[in-house]
Curated annotation (Swiss-Prot):
Keyword Transmembrane: yes
Domain of life of the source: Eukaryota
Localisation: Membrane
Keyword Transmembrane helix tagged: yes
Ranges of biased composition (kind: Low complexity): 37-57
Name used for this protein in its record: Putative uncharacterized protein DDB_G0286831
Key words of the record: Membrane, Transmembrane, Transmembrane helix
Positions of the UniProt region annotated as Disordered: 23-64
GO CC, one annotated term: membrane
Topology with respect to the bilayer: Single-pass membrane protein
Primary subcellular site in the record, as a coarse category: membrane
Transmembrane feature ranges: 76-98
Length: 107
């Protein structure tokens, strides 16, 4: 669920529309604005390569955010993601703690 929430923030937020993604046609560090097709890629080239797994694709986009020049948009987006992850950790810890206490008292 946390992975889904993180992807929603990165892909769905208007604040992230200036992030850069790597070109699918090569392994070089060519940056292409998200939402634009690569000028160098073609269907014949892309069909010969194995499609990346969703996790790898997500990690590549995440890494490119750090490589790209820091903008207010990307900083804001990652601030939201970090808060969501931190908040999820805290709620998990407190829930586990209270459940353990209740189980011990009932015995």
């Amino acid at each position: 669920m946390m992975n889904f929430a993180t992807r929603s923030v990165l892909r769905g937020s208007i604040k992230v529309n200036r992030l850069y993604t790597a070109s699918a046609s090569s392994s070089s560090s060519t940056r292409i604005p998200s939402g634009f097709a690569s000028a160098t890629s073609s269907k014949s080239n892309s069909s010969t390569k194995s499609s990346p797994s969703p996790i790898n694709s997500f990690n590549n986009k995440t890494n490119n955010i750090f490589k790209s020049n820091a903008t207010n948009n990307s900083s804001l987006a990652f601030g939201i993601v970090e808060f969501m992850v931190f908040n999820g950790m805290i709620s998990t810890i407190t829930t586990t703690t209270f459940n353990n206490n209740n189980n011990n008292n009932n015995k």
